[in-house]
Amino acid sequence: MTRRYECVIRGRSTASPQTLFALVADGSRWSQWAAPLIPYSAWESLSPAGDSGVGAIRAVGRRKRPTREMVTIHEPGRRHGYTMLIDGPIHDYQAQVTFVEDADGTQVTWRGRYETRWRAVGAAYWLILRVVLGTLTRKLIIAAERQDG
């Protein structure tokens, strides 16, 4: 039986949705704002349209064994989504980062979901994902606020 898991992290930023989106959508710059969690980042290939949109593949993590992620959602200023291109105990990992502007700034929501057949793997990965997505969300907000000055 396949089990589904989801982790949702929320944050608030004074930066604009456009600034937040520009940082998260540029796969080559993740190592600049997400270090030391992400020490390496690069575009492996661009989208069929020749940009960083849907279909582009980034490599993030360790230079020798990066994680490959394909962009699945590219809505500038609103949403960025990706899937991990991995084989292993988890399947169908999908993540998206959404930006909603309101009177107080921008609400940032980073959501990751995946499937696995093993309950222990699902629970352990959820704990790891909570730390990773929480760290990425905080680092993204800090970098965007510095950039917006």
Language model features with spans:
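Hydrophobic/aromatic beta-strand elements that line small-molecule binding cavities or substrate pockets
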Residues: 9-11, 67-73, 93-101, 112
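Short, well-ordered strand-loop elements centered on a beta-strand within folded domains, enriched
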Residues: 54, 81-83, 104-112
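Hydrophobic ligand-binding cavity/cleft-lining segments
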Residues: 1-47
